[in-house]
From Swiss-Prot:
Disruption phenotype: Mutant mice show primary ciliary dyskinesia defects such as hydrocephalus and laterality defects and die within 5 weeks of birth. The morphology of mutant motile cilia is normal, but their motility is completely lost. The 9 + 2 arrangement of microtubules remain normal in mutants, but the outer dynein arms (ODAs) is absent from the cilia.
Biased composition (Basic and acidic residues): 188-202, 273-283, 417-431
InterPro entries, sorted: CS_DNAAF11_C, Leu-rich_rpt, LRR_dom_sf
LRR repeats by residue range: 22-43, 45-66, 67-88, 89-110
Gene of this entry: Dnaaf11
Name of the protein this chain belongs to: Dynein axonemal assembly factor 11
Composition-biased stretches (Low complexity): 397-408
Lineage: Eukaryota, Metazoa, Chordata, Craniata, Vertebrata
Location within or outside the cell: Cytoplasm; Cell projection, Cilium; Dynein axonemal particle; Cell projection, Cilium, Flagellum
Organism for this UniProt entry: Mus musculus (Mouse)
Length: 473
């Protein structure tokens, strides 16, 4: 059964940014609430309050709601109108389909001078003779009763016959009170019988529906061992019989005729709640546990797993002789939730308990590996040096001999060299060479070119160089 809690009110106050002290409208319908409480202390500014389709049996703890204008208590278990004198601005009251049999309790609403609309249809008092005339005369401020407007002539006629109508209402109330007392006794007797039957079932069988004895044997005999394989079959049969009994009990409950009383409503709700709990318990039993993720098979094979569903890239850096793993970890995730385990043949990363595992093509050195995380993107970069050292051609002494032999081979068989060559010949590029587009030497003006100077001959001492005379070609 539900209760009014602060969390419940706050969840239904999303339209007010979950602020409850300034709340003006609140809807708590279909919450299986049995008692009105805390609302008058937490939400004093309420103007509209919806409490229909609950199990409220008494109007209480609403006297401090001075600003309340509309109160909806339809489809509840209310038997008397009371404790509404403090709701000074109450304009509309809905008590449709309740169990109000004391029609004289409407006199408590005479203090609510602003009350204009009242709904009492579906209550036992609405079947009383003279019901409408009594309410119209008792509540002079009413304008509408059960959705029908009260005219002035109707009120005058009801006022003329008020004495006889009031006496008639009192007699019908007494008869109803006697009938209700019998109904309560009958409901109490049925409840005690059901409790006794349940206690007998629990005492006759175990907590799980099986029979038990106090006889214990230290070592079972051979015949008993032969009977053990048949135990699951008997358990399954007992389970099936229990399910069939539950189905029969459920059908019997719904087909059983019952009176429309607050006790019958409570009984129906308890039965539905019991069924719901049994269904939840059965679903939990049937729910299978998730099998553990297999990372390494029994024969030692490492599997590739990406349960975290992260993007990644694996690169083989031949220049630095290492393998680089770039894992796209969530940007705002805390680094403490990441665990990295580098092994010679695989790398494993646990991201929030979910494994990411990759098998490596070559062995790496775990002790020299490093893991770094980017502060901007959040990516995790794992560098794993390979076990084998990088081999370079310039570090060995017999390189010259080999180069000569290879050069001679290349000269003898140039076609073979051309076929086996991995790199593209630079002379066969289809793109033009940008560096040779402008040829400075060819287009340089002649006057800028350096002119050769004729040095005077040492043989002719009288030679004088005239710069105006052009040189002989």
């Amino acid at each position: 059964m539900g209760r009014i809690t602060e969390d419940l009110i706050r969840r239904n106050a999303e339209h007010n940014d979950c602020v409850i002290f300034s709340l003006e409208e609140l809807s708590l319908h279909q919450q299986e609430i049995e008692r009105l409480e805390h609302i008058d202390k937490w939400c004093r500014d309420l103007k509209i309050l919806y409490l229909q389709n609950n199990l409220i049996g008494k109007i209480e703890n609403v006297s401090k709601l001075k600003k309340l204008e509309y109160l909806n208590l339809a489809l509840n278990n209310i038997e008397r109108i009371e404790n509404l004198e403090g709701c000074e601005w109450l304009t509309k009251l809905d008590l449709t389909v309740n169990f109000i049999g004391e029609l004289s309790s409407v006199k408590t609403l005479t203090h609510n001078i602003h009350l204009k609309e009242l709904f009492l249809m579906g209550n036992p008092c609405a079947d009383f003779d003279g019901y409408r005339q009594f309410v119209v005369v008792t509540l002079q401020q009413l304008k509408w009763l059960d959705g029908k407007e009260i005219e002035r002539s109707e009120r005058i006629q009801a006022l003329q016959n008020y004495t006889s109508v009031e006496q008639q209402i009192r007699e019908q109330e007494k008869a109803y009170c006697l009938r209700r007392a019998k109904e309560k006794e009958e409901a109490q007797r049925k409840l005690e019988e059901e409790n006794e039957s349940e206690d007998k079932k629990k005492s006759s069988t175990g907590f799980d529906g099986h029979w038990y004895t106090d006889i214990h044997t230290a070592c079972p005999s051979a015949t008993e061992n032969q009977d053990y394989p048949q135990v699951p079959e008997t358990q399954e049969e007992q389970h099936n019989t229990k399910e069939s009994d539950d189905i029969e009990d459920d059908l019997a409950f719904w087909n059983k005729p019952s009176l429309f009383t607050p006790e019958s409503r409570l009984e129906t709700l308890r039965h539905m709640e019991k069924q719901r709990k049994a269904q939840d318990k059965l679903s939990e039993k049937k729910k299978k546990a998730k099998p553990p993720r297999t990372l390494i098979t029994e024969d030692g094979k490492v599997l590739n797993v990406n349960e975290a569903k992260l993007d990644f890239s694996l690169k083989d850096d031949e220049k630095h002789n290492q393998i680089i793993l770039d894992l796209a970890v969530y940007r705002y995730m805390d680094t403490s939730l990441i665990e990295v385990d580098v092994q010679p043949t695989y790398v494993r990363v646990m991201v929030k308990g979910k494994p990411f595992q990759l098998a490596l093509s070559t062995e790496v050195q775990p002790d020299r590996s490093s893991a770094k995380r980017s502060q901007t993107t959040g990516h995790l970069l794992i560098c794993m040096p390979k076990v084998g050292e990088m081999i370079t051609g310039g570090q060995r002494t017999p390189t010259s001999v080999k180069t000569t032999s290879t050069s001679s081979r290349e000269q003898t068989n140039p076609r073979k060299k051309q076929i086996e060559r991995l790199e593209v010949d630079p002379s066969k590029h289809s793109c033009p060479d940008v560096s040779t587009i402008v040829q400075e030497k060819r287009h340089r003006p002649k006057r800028m070119e350096s002119q050769p100077r004729d040095e005077p001959s040492e043989e002719d001492p009288d030679f004088e160089d005239n710069p105006e005379v052009p040189p002989l070609i």
